[in-house]
Amino acid sequence: MIPALFLAAALGGMLRFLLSKIGPYVGTFIANMAACVVLAAVRDASPLVMAAVGTGFAGALSTWSTLAKELGTLIRQRRWAMLLGYTTATILGGMVAVWCGLQI
């Protein structure tokens, strides 16, 4: 189980790195939405799949710390409309992404 977890986490981390090259906000948003879909999709999987794909891949792909940094930057820059839009899109988008994952 541990090698599968490590491999999946490495793949999730590499994908997040590639998505970060799109730019701030967009790359983070895509990574977090994709992780929501993946995690919801494997909810009933075997413990090995849940550990590898859910914890490893989706855990490494998603990024709470980068989201917090980006929101903090928007607050410091007093970009209130962007802050509200990004926060709302992330919350609502996450719910839609989970719903999509549950349909798989």
Swiss-Prot record:
Keywords: Cell membrane, Ion channel, Ion transport, Membrane, Metal-binding, Sodium, Transmembrane, Transmembrane helix, Transport. Na(+) is not transported, but it plays an essential structural role and its presence is essential for fluoride channel function. One of its GO terms (biological process) is cellular detoxification of fluoride. Na(+) binds at G59, S62. It is a multi-pass membrane protein. Signal peptide: none annotated. This is Fluoride-specific ion channel FluC 2. The lineage of its organism: Bacteria, Bacillati, Actinomycetota, Actinomycetes, Mycobacteriales.
